[in-house]
Regions:
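A short, histidine- and acid-enriched strand-loop-helix "catalytic/donor-clamping" loop
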Residues: 49, 70-87
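Structural motif
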Residues: 39-42, 68-70, 106, 155
Length: 171
């Protein structure tokens, strides 16, 4: 089941279990020599349980078996509205982010705002603004029969989950 049993954003147990199982598969490929310095690993979320094993393995492996690692930074400790602030996770998460910044090849963000946030927080690795992880045309294809903007009823739609992190009271 994909229901959130523990937590407010993703199920803490389910997310951790899935991430760790994926990392287990990656570690096996690294051990087998299937992953080399020509490979690139991309994580859609900087906080991925198990990620911390990569620098441990790569620092002890020959350079030809050290893949490039990129990941997406979604908000985390630089966003005062992020759920982890509310849940009291700031201190250990900031240290986790600093650990990640020590070994990744680069960090992807959605906008220039996040570049400023990360630099202010002391991040050193290259940061790339990649925009949103989906294309405008793909989104438009999912909504049939759209009207020109001037012909639409003026109303606000709240498309996020109903969590304080997304500030639903603003609407």
């Amino acid at each position: 089941s994909k229901a959130i049993v523990t937590g407010s954003v993703l199920d803490a147990h389910g997310r951790s279990y899935y991430s760790l199982s994926q990392t287990m598969n990656l570690v096996q490929k690294m051990k087998n020599g299937e992953i080399t310095s020509d490979d690139v690993i991309f994580y859609e979320d900087m906080f991925t349980p198990g990620l911390e094993c990569l620098p441990y393995i790569m620092d002890q492996s020959p350079p030809e078996y050290r893949p490039k690692v990129f990941l997406r930074f979604l908000a985390q400790t630089t966003d005062p509205d992020d759920f982890l602030i509310r849940e009291g996770m700031f201190d250990w998460m900031r240290r986790y982010e600093q650990m990640v910044d020590e070994f990744v090849t680069g960090i992807c963000v959605a906008s220039e705002v996040f570049v400023a946030h990360l630099r202010t927080a002391g991040f050193k690795k290259p940061i790339y603004v990649t925009g949103l992880p989906f294309g405008k045309s793909e989104v438009q294809e999912r909504v049939p029969n759209t009207k020109p903007l001037k012909e639409r009823t003026k109303r606000v739609g709240f498309a996020a989950r109903w969590d304080d992190e997304k500030q639903p009271h603003f609407y």
